[in-house]
Design a protein with these regions (language model features):
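Short, solvent-exposed loop/turn elements at beta->coil junctions and helix N-caps
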Residues: 17-20, 133-137
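Alpha-helical and coiled-coil interaction segments, frequently adjacent to or embedded
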Residues: 1-16, 21-24
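Acidic, metal-coordinating catalytic segment for phosphate/diphosphate chemistry
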Residues: 22-65, 73, 77-83
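A short coil-to-beta-strand element that immediately follows conserved catalytic motifs
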Residues: 13, 124-131
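Conserved Nudix-box catalytic region and its N-terminal flanking loop in Nudix hydrolases
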Residues: 47-50, 64-115, 157-158
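Alpha-helical hinge/cap motifs
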Residues: 107, 119-122
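Conserved active-site beta-strand-loop modules that form the wall/rim of enzyme catalytic pockets
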Residues: 67, 127-128, 144-146
Length: 159
């Protein structure tokens, strides 16, 4: 394959897709083949993909007080990670995070972070600037994240 040729979605052949688990989250199994860098199609592979939708997050900043606003939440995944020797945090499933929320169908990501900022931190976002839109863990999930920086007044925020 020519070094200047870029591979794209048209270089993937979906053979089968099936839902293997449907609960709070969904897991789909994809059987597919994809073009390799040498130009030929590779063998069939099977991969499970964690489907949880898409999310939006906001790093809240108060420029008048020169403060960042974070929240603390219990996370089941962090609890499960406590059994791993690779999880070297403080041993707590309560994490310090930026505000985030799941994007519902036909919902604007900016509206999600404005709503979540009020619900989770009691902050109204005055200005919002998109930092990036990216895939969170593309090796095993289709989830994408819209990350913003938002101007807030943190003078009434507790914690």
């Amino acid at each position: 394959m020519d070094k200047k040729t870029r591979l794209s979605a048209s270089d993937v052949k979906l053979i089968r897709k099936e839902t293997t688990h449907q609960g709070y989250f969904r897991i789909d199994r994809y059987n597919m083949r994809h073009r390799q860098f040498v130009g030929a199609m590779g063998p069939e592979i099977s991969r499970e993909i964690f489907e949880r939708g898409h999310a939006a997050s906001v790093l809240m900043y108060d420029p008048d007080m020169d403060l960042l606003v974070f929240i603390e939440q219990f996370r089941p995944g962090a609890y499960a990670a406590l059994s791993s020797p690779w999880f070297k945090q403080d041993g707590s499933p309560w994490l310090i995070e930026i505000v985030a929320g799941i994007i519902e169908d036909d919902e604007d990501p900016g509206d999600v972070v404005r709503r979540e900022a009020v619900e989770e931190a009691g902050c109204t976002v005055d200005e919002l600037e998109l930092i990036s839109h990216y895939l969170v863990t593309p090796g095993g999930s289709s989830e994408s994240m819209f990350s913003y920086c938002g101007r807030v007044d943190a003078s009434d925020v507790g914690g």
